[in-house]
């Protein structure tokens, strides 16, 4: 319309689209992840989870591991296992206390250096996107972008509740999310403001398989600009019993 505005039709929201059964959603995510050279694992109990991690670390001959912070990783408390396997762990630094709750520059530099020196980066994710087999990482998961991109091997852990069907659903959830998807933002719908007083989440990264590039001769090379190996481990609720 000339001289005016036209209201575009809204895109269909996830709640309007047919619901995909949870098991089918998981199968689709794993199939799409495999299609882009990722590796899917399922941990049905704590012993299975530790076995999967042990196998990955041994096969990659890892010595140094960079670990991000998020609620799932905190609940799992993987540090004792990693130490028992002889890993040198670098965990995203905790917030300070008292009058200075900000993470210092020296701590940030130290974690960045450790991430680039690590063989394996272990992170949580915000969502596992079934439509494309993508892992969705935001700046709400502290250290996830460094530890998912700098080491040559990325290991991501997620729960069934973090599986989403479509990009529309991811964007809808992010628009109302607090510091993590399960925590609503107190500043209202449509805001990307964090719910913990630490400011907005500044970025969202969609990790779809391994890093890959090709030159003019169309020779595909993996792992040049990021991890050449990506693992996604489903952590079932029975891992906590």
Q: What is the meaning of each model-derived region?
A:
Residues 1-181, 197-241:
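The feature marks the mature, well-folded catalytic cores of soluble enzymes
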Residues 188-196:
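Glycine-biased, low-complexity coil/linker segments
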